[in-house]
Amino acid sequence: METQLSNGPTCNNTANGPTTINNNCSSPVDSGNTEDSKTNLIVNYLPQNMTQEELKSLFGSIGEIESCKLVRDKITGQSLGYGFVNYIDPKDAEKAINTLNGLRLQTKTIKVSYARPSSASIRDANLYVSGLPKTMTQKELEQLFSQYGRIITSRILVDQVTGISRGVGFIRFDKRIEAEEAIKGLNGQKPPGATEPITVKFANNPSQKTNQAILSQLYQSPNRRYPGPLAQQAQRFRLDNLLNMAYGVKRFSPMTIDGMTSLAGINIPGHPGTGWCIFVYNLAPDADESILWQMFGPFGAVTNVKVIRDFNTNKCKGFGFVTMTNYDEAAMAIASLNGYRLGDRVLQVSFKTNKTHKA
């Protein structure tokens, strides 16, 4: 049975607060553990393009640092938006919290607090949330989930052109048990302002280990004819040479779908004005948007992903679309992913044409 949920705990912290803000939030979002280390800090809501050296430089201005680590995705190498800074002197750590917590960096307002010691209980606590109301803000998302535990990071995916929410978000809890409780309490429920129930699940739960292994092969496998995006950055091939190699040698026999042509069809479709649309065919019935984000994200800026689902079963109909802002990045993604085996299926990836499947 669907249940209409009430708002969670409220907090008077704002995303656009001053450089130093008061932590007056009573929810677990900003709770610290006074019994833990007084030198090790966790820094949340870092800009996606911030490097570890920049993080170290920022916090090194406060005092001498023993260690600094920007946490990255093990598969893609992309920043997860948070990191750890360990000072030598506890006084410097306290000063860093007082000085840098609430600092505005680009479009982010960072959060600095004492870190908990690493343990098995805090791993795999990242949740994938879909079906969110398009009007829901990141603060409201945190309020909804904060009743279940301490939130490390949160994110709502938005269209980079319009700025409108895609109705999809991520919540990373301090502990896995907190994430499990959030799934029990919120999955299939209706948050305030929603007309449909939301879906809450682990971003990388046990049932997705196969996909994770596949994606790992995509970026790391030495047996791939064409290296993944991380390896490509180290190659000295120009993009045009790579494309010539990718499509000059037939890697498999692509089927023709409704007259659809691949990039090898010579004619590249025109730019639609909002990005380059890529058609992805032969997806599995249980494929979802998160797989497309993980596959295409490392190649460049992705503004939209969409898996086309059957109206009656809500299962993937076998294809989807990915929109990227940059042509070269989109072409590179196609060169690497067209003909790639995802599970027991060989993907067909091409620029969308007028004859491509329609949603």
Swiss-Prot record:
The protein's role, per its UniProt record: RNA-binding protein that binds to the 3' untranslated region (3'UTR) of target mRNAs. Seems to recognize a GAAA motif. Can bind to its own 3'UTR, the FOS 3'UTR and the ID 3'UTR.
Question: Tell me, how does this one assemble?
Answer: Interacts with IGF2BP1. Interacts with MAP1B light chain LC1.
From the UniProt record, give one GO term of the biological process aspect: regulation of DNA-templated transcription
Q: Which residues form the RRM domain?
A: 39-117, 125-205, 276-354
Q: Which CDD domains match?
A: RRM1_HuB, RRM2_HuB, RRM3_HuB
Gene3D superfamilies recorded:
3.30.70.330
Q: Which GO terms describe its molecular function?
A: mRNA 3'-UTR binding; RNA binding
UniProt-recorded name of the protein? ELAV-like protein 2
- Write the record's keywords in alphabetical order, separated by commas: Phosphoprotein, Repeat, RNA-binding
Q: Origin, by domain of life?
A: Eukaryota
SUPFAM superfamilies found in the cross-reference section = RNA-binding domain, RBD (SSF54928)
Describe, from its UniProt entry, the tissues in which this protein is expressed: Brain; neural-specific.
Q: According to its record, what are the GO cellular component terms?
A: ribonucleoprotein complex
User: Which NCBIfam families does UniProt cross-reference here?
Assistant: ELAV_HUD_SF
Give the family per the record.
Belongs to the RRM elav family.
Region ranges (Disordered):
1-33
A Pfam family per the record: RRM_1
Q: Which residues carry this modification: Phosphoserine?
A: S221
